Regions:
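Macrodomain-like recognition of ADP-ribose-binding/processing modules
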Residues: 1-134
């Protein structure tokens, strides 16, 4: 996992890098990492998947009032992991998804990303790695 840590602050993307952010099911990218994702092509109204040089993983419902349960977030993370597997030439910088506006702790979200351990093209926040490898 050495060298596969997402920087705490991402201000620019190198060629082939994808910014992976927490979104809502309405695709309203108005705050947090979702708002930052607009800089790199996130599409207003698109909740999940590849959007420009970004990839959305919903953690809130369409109304943005309800935080999705872990079991509701899990399928979106599974889809992301499959996407990363079939796109090895892209490097995915996963942010602290679900740990900002959705108020989860890394210990809650990190286990969803265990499937990326062997994927060299996925970088996770150090807080996620600590929980996955503990």
């Amino acid at each position: 996992m050495e060298g596969r840590v997402t920087p705490e602050l991402i201000e620019d993307l190198a060629e082939g890098q994808v910014f992976v952010f927490g979104s809502n099911q309405g695709g309203k990218h108005g705050k947090g990492a979702a708002k930052t994702a607009l800089t790199w092509g996130a599409k207003w109204g698109q909740a999940a998947g590849l959007q420009g040089r970004t990839y959305g993983i919903p953690t809130k419902d369409k109304s943005i009032r309800r935080v999705l349960r872990i079991d509701e977030i899990a399928p979106f993370v599974d889809d992301f992991i499959e996407f990363a597997k079939v796109n090895p030439k892209l490097t995915f910088l996963v942010t602290l998804i679900g740990c900002g506006l959705s108020n989860y702790k890394p210990k809650n979200i990190a286990p969803l990303f265990k499937g990326v351990i062997l994927l060299d093209n996925v970088h996770l926040p150090k807080q996620f790695w600590h929980k996955i490898l503990a």
